[in-house]
Amino acid sequence: QAEKAELQSVDLINRLLLKPQIGVDFQSVIRSLDSRQIRVELEPHALEWNVPLETLNDDRYFFDQERLYLSGRRQGRLIRIGQRLKLKVIRVDVLQRNIDFDFEGWLN
């Protein structure tokens, strides 16, 4: 119970911090990934957030569970933990607990 409340508080603080940052680009690092989303850390704030794979609009990515990476269907790009990308904050909904990003490009 207490751990869940703490996580909800951290998420609320993250949303409040990003609300005035709409339209701002952030360099980000992938901290984890799965078949539906990547978890990124936004620099320099060290805020972590889940980003749906559909946000990565440069290709259609599939998760390789054995090798723990995403593979692009058209371009063959491999996405791994630690990879850097640029994301733009486009919407923050504090009440709905949601932050939406636009994918701006890969940094490495």
Q: Residue locations for each model-derived region?
A:
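Structured C-terminal cores of nucleic-acid metabolism proteins
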Residues: Q1-N108
